[in-house]
Amino acid sequence: MGLENGIVLQVGGKIDPDAAILKVPGIEKVDWYDNPEPGFTYYDICYWRKYWNIRDILFDNCHAKESNHAYPLTIKQLESIRDDIYYLICDGEDQWDTSRAMWSFEDSVGRLGWDIVRISELIRYLKTDVGYCEAFFYDSY
């Protein structure tokens, strides 16, 4: 099972430093993304380590079949991922399956709430005319 997965934004060039997406806590430029394409900048939107329940949500929404890959995400898929994470939180601690995440519900709920905010801002950003940009789900094992 994938140990690290997340959502990254690939942008041709750079984002305007005053863009709202860069004001959201936790969205940061990253230099570590595997196989970067020249001329592109990458931003970490969400990162999950040992959250197999979140990985399942991502795999289901992008119809991923193999780990250790990057999968492009549409706005519709991002909306579905965001909603699924919201419902995971709403289900509450009683429904939190500790075998599907290394972290407790109590340790996760605030972080997942911020993930919903970051994904929502990513969706807003992608809906604007910002030039070339694309969101990816990455899975590494």
Model region roles, listed by residue range:
Residues 135:
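Active-site regions of oxyanion-processing enzymes, predominantly non-cytosolic
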